[in-house]
Amino acid sequence: MPSVSSDAPLLDPKNDYVFKRLFAQRIDLLTDLVNLVRGGAEPLKLTEILNPHILPEDITGKQIVLDVRALDSRGRSIDVEVQVRAQRDYSARALYYLARSLVDQIGESEAYSKLRSVIGVSILDFQLFREPGEEANGQWRFAMRADQQLDQPDQPPRPPRELEVQLEMNFLELPKLARLGLEKTNKPLYDWC
């Protein structure tokens, strides 16, 4: 049997094939990565890898093929994507994927109470957020919540209120993280990147 050289090049995990093979077969690694990307959010316990295909609602609709799709212990769908090529409208695409994952959960006569949150994790090899002040952040989490009470603007603010069923989007911009000294501020995430 030929020996494997320690000088052999490693496969790039940003490659779709490598990413899918690695994380679709190792739910423990996927769980660790998703929790690190989500930062301080409540940790997830992923329990099942799902079919990554989301079929169109009709023959003219868009078919979605995610890199990895999983379910957590509370029935929430976790959609994970790696995107190497820059796309200016990527955040709209990511939101569309989450919305379709939400819509896919129930059929025509099923109760809305069956809906569970959908959490998206996008690992980007480009800078998505480029506005002034955004260059110092490479890890983002967006969720639907009420930041203020519009009917009582003169009152002290209440804590933000999140909806029970969420569309949560997490973005990790790899080029920024390399610049921002992630090795010192978040070593476990740095080791993944």
Question: PLM features: what roles do these ranges have?
Answer:
Residues 1-193:
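Elongated, amphipathic alpha-helical interaction scaffolds
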